[in-house]
């Protein structure tokens, strides 16, 4: 009987990528298959996030729920990976003695050896070391589950923003060699992937050797140009970028590489220079706006999303007003916005914070309501237009329909003959947008590629 692994992922797309790799590693080493049901699993893994306190505490809450499964199934192994594991280490086992494995983002490739050691010794195994970029040398080829895929191009962060734990949980920035990344992307393209998202905590800080051991370095713009030349790749996305690393070379890439989508996620975090300085972000609002101005000179319709923190220590009403002014000026399509959550061990955790919680909550609600207005306005402006989408699979709303994504990352549901579904999935097609809804669009097929056209008849 095939053994199964269940992985629950918290946090960012880097963690989603790492979770897929955990499954790949265990499949290659032990033949385990992924399950979406923890009750069916022989191994349960939590890939954790420590960016906010709420996410961290939810891990321990979920661990408590699977404890009963372990009591009913003694051979079940429970593991905690990711940033909480890196930050807490062996204290996780002290708090939850039924946990068998604790591993960091850089040691997930050692899972088979840790499992063997746990079974042989009967003791919990903890490995939260930072062996640079070693894990990529030990990962099996990716198993593709659709026409889109994530590719991690670097690990860690060296920015040390005053509020952030990532440099402490993932280590400093280390880039994969260029040829390693290109080999992975080419392998994905051979399996039918048409869109890749290049991942890194500060992805545009990429500085990868041309090959292992080479002294020549490729920057992020060079990497994008090479990825665009790989046969089969039709779209390139990346996340998360940092304003401080947005070079003119990267800006020029938006003119040179049409496959680079017309959407950018560029976290600003705040709209007040005073708060940005306290956050140690390393740029001013004017410098941030300058990057966007240059990009929109090349791509006038570039859509923009961001991250924002409300209620950072010392934030005044004037600071918040400046944030809202920036939101209106930039016209953000989406914002991942949260109330500041102090993280132990970060400089900002020691700052005086005298803003009442209810004030922070009102500010957050105002910010999110404004962003939602932007989202609705942009979605409505797309009605009547023809959009190029990548068909990802059956619609969640109606399995008799198909769904795909626009360049600005909106889901479009559209009807198509059932017999055409297998051939349409993975194709780039054109749809006319007929309706805009709060979280999706609806359209109709108007133009397809030759292959897809044949599939509809």
UniProtKB/Swiss-Prot annotation:
Entry binding sites for [4Fe-4S] cluster 1: 12, 49, 83
Pfam family, one: TRAM
Cofactor(s) required for function per UniProt: [4Fe-4S] cluster
GO CC field: cytosol
Stored SMART domains: Elp3
GO molecular function, one term: N6-isopentenyladenosine methylthiotransferase activity
InterPro entries, A to Z: Elp3/MiaA/NifB-like_rSAM, Methylthiotransferase, Methylthiotransferase_CS, Methylthiotransferase_N, Methylthiotransferase_N_sf, MiaB_methiolase, rSAM, rSAM_horseshoe
EC identifiers of the protein: 2.8.4.3
Domain Radical SAM core: 143-377
Location in the cell: Cytoplasm
Residue positions binding [4Fe-4S] cluster 2: 157, 161, 164
Chief location of this protein within or outside the cell: cytoplasm
Domain MTTase N-terminal: 3-120
CDD domains in the record: Radical_SAM
Catalytic activity line of the entry: N(6)-dimethylallyladenosine(37) in tRNA + (sulfur carrier)-SH + AH2 + 2 S-adenosyl-L-methionine = 2-methylsulfanyl-N(6)-dimethylallyladenosine(37) in tRNA + (sulfur carrier)-H + 5'-deoxyadenosine + L-methionine + A + S-adenosyl-L-homocysteine + 2 H(+)
Note on how the cofactor is bound: Binds 2 [4Fe-4S] clusters. One cluster is coordinated with 3 cysteines and an exchangeable S-adenosyl-L-methionine.
Source organism, top-level taxon: Bacteria
TRAM domain location: 380-447
Assembly mode: Monomer.
Family from the record: Belongs to the methylthiotransferase family. MiaB subfamily.
HAMAP family: tRNA_metthiotr_MiaB
Name this polypeptide is given: tRNA-2-methylthio-N(6)-dimethylallyladenosine synthase
Species this chain originates from: Burkholderia cenocepacia (strain ATCC BAA-245 / DSM 16553 / LMG 16656 / NCTC 13227 / J2315 / CF5610) (Burkholderia cepacia (strain J2315))
Organism lineage: Bacteria, Pseudomonadati, Pseudomonadota, Betaproteobacteria, Burkholderiales
Gene that this polypeptide is encoded by: miaB
């Amino acid at each position: 009987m095939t053994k199964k692994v269940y992985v629950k992922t918290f946090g960012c797309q880097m963690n989603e990528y790492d979770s897929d790799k955990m499954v790949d590693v265990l499949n290659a080493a032990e033949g385990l298959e992924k399950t979406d049901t923890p009750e069916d699993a022989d191994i349960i893994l939590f890939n954790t996030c420590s960016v906010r306190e709420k996410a961290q505490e939810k891990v321990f809450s979920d661990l408590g729920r699977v404890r009963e499964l372990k009591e009913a199934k003694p051979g079940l192994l429970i593991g905690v990976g990711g940033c909480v594991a890196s930050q807490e280490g062996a204290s996780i086992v002290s708090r939850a003695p039924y946990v068998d494995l604790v591993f960091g983002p850089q040691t997930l490739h050692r899972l088979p050896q840790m499992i063997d050691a746990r079974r042989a010794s009967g003791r919990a195994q903890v490995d939260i070391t930072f062996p640079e970029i070693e894990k990529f040398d030990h990962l099996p080829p990716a198993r593709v589950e659709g026409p889109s895929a994530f590719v991690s191009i670097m690990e860690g962060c060296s920015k040390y923003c005053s509020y952030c734990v990532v440099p402490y949980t993932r280590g400093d920035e280390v880039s994969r060699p260029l040829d390693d990344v290109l080999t992975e992307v080419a392998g994905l393209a051979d399996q039918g992937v048409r869109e890749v998202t290049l991942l890194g905590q500060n992805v545009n800080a990429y500085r990868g050797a041309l090959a292992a051991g080479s002294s020549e370095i490729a920057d992020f713009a060079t990497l994008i140009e090479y990825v665009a030349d790989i046969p089969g790749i039709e779209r390139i996305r990346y996340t998360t970028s940092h304003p401080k690393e947005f070079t003119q070379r990267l800006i020029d890439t938006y003119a040179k590489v049409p496959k680079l989508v017309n959407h950018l996620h560029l976290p600003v975090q705040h709209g007040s220079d005073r708060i940005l300085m306290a956050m140690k972000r390393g740029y001013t609002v004017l410098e941030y706006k300058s990057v966007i101005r240059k990009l929109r000179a090349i791509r006038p319709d570039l859509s923009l999303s961001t991250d924002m923190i409300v209620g950072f220590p010392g934030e005044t009403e004037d600071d918040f007003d400046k944030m809202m002014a920036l939101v209106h000026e930039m016209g953000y399509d989406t914002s991942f916005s949260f109330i500041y959550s102090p993280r132990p061990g970060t400089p900002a955790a020691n700052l005086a914070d005298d803003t009442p919680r209810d004030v922070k909550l009102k500010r957050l609600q105002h910010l999110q309501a404004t962003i939602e207005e932007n989202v609705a306005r942009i979605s409505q402006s797309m009605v009547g237009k023809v959009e190029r989408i990548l068909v990802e699979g059956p619609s969640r709303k109606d399995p008799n329909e198909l769904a795909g994504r626009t360049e600005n990352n909106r889901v479009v549901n559209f009807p198509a003959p059932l017999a055409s579904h297998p051939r349409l999935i993975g194709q780039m097609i054109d749809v006319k947008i007929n309706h805009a809804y709060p979280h999706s669009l609806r359209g109709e097929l108007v133009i397809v590629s030759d292959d897809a056209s044949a599939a509809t008849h």
